[in-house]
Amino acid sequence: MSTPTTPLSYKDAGVDIDAGNALVNNIKSAVKRTRRPEVMGNLGGFGALCELPTKYKHPVLVSGTDGVGTKLRLAIDYKKHDNVGVDLVAMCSNDLIVSGAEPLFFLDYYATGKLDVEVATAVVKGIAEGCVQSGCALIGGETAEMPGMYEGDDYDLAGFCVGVVEKEEIIDGTKVQDGDALIALASSGPHSNGFSLIRKVLEVSKADPAQELAGKPLIDHLLEPTKIYVKSLLKLLEQHDVHAMSHITGGGFWENIPRVLPEDCKAVVKSDSWQWPVVFNWLMENGNISEFEMYRTFNCGVGMVVALPADKVDSALELLTAEGENAWLIGNIAKRNGEEEQVEIL
């Protein structure tokens, strides 16, 4: 056994504590923007504290965790780090609102082999922006610098969100019935799903991600941040009896809509009620992807589907439009017979 001639430090092993401290200083102002009145204490404690809002009589906590998937690979390769933080919050908070829950707080996990303070700052500022859009507080997180675990400039992200809903107002799909209307809320693009297939299409088509598509680079279409629907849907819930909501993520229409439907109901989706955004047509054509596979993998322009009584469609659409959403009637709920699929796309 030999002894080093010079003393070793943590930095010699690849972990730079000073870089971590610099990151914390860089993000303080962004994190402060997300603060809610229920948050107790400041960033940096061993545990983050948050009271329950006093307006809830019988509060139920709703939690969710998610990542950004291989969308990160494109963001890293093309050095576009600003939006993946928004994606991270969106994937978690949009899942919470499906139950009717108001997001309260968010925590992030950022892991890398060597901490690049500038990149990490851009990512966390994006997370803070996503929290502002969702109305939740960024109350903590973990930055893990792990030499030997990640190659080059690679990093990974995970997010954790907790929300609250009144027990009597939980939305679980049990009220869905034959004759309900289905309203679609437009997506901003592929959001954060299907990127392994997207990257495969780029590979086999040998397409240049910088090429123009409908007035902007293809890569910008692909990396457009995930739309956050929380505030507009909370407004909708205040005024309408919503029976169910489905966040269209991995698995597309076929997998996500049935998650909120009773066994005896099916969703009838009218494909002529909207036009796919150009990026989905590009993917379908350049990847020779079937329509079935498109609907099973991507949101195809629909980020959220809402089920509610048919006589409330006009007022719901008016409200959602006023809140800045592009929303439309996409279909209806019908009786399901026997072994029929729970999603029918006409």
UniProtKB/Swiss-Prot annotation:
NCBIfam families referenced in this protein's UniProt entry, alphabetically: purM
Pathway: Purine metabolism; IMP biosynthesis via de novo pathway; 5-amino-1-(5-phospho-D-ribosyl)imidazole from N(2)-formyl-N(1)-(5-phospho-D-ribosyl)glycinamide: step 2/2
Keywords: ATP-binding, Cytoplasm, Ligase, Nucleotide-binding, Purine biosynthesis
Enzyme class, first EC level, given as a word: ligase
This protein's encoding gene: purM
InterPro entries: PurM-like_C_dom, PurM-like_C_sf, PurM-like_N, PurM-like_N_sf, PurM_cligase
Pfam family, one: AIRS_C
The family this protein is said to belong to: Belongs to the AIR synthase family.
The organism of origin for this protein: Shewanella pealeana (strain ATCC 700345 / ANG-SQ1)
Protein name: Phosphoribosylformylglycinamidine cyclo-ligase
GO MF annotations, alphabetized: ATP binding; phosphoribosylamine-glycine ligase activity; phosphoribosylformylglycinamidine cyclo-ligase activity
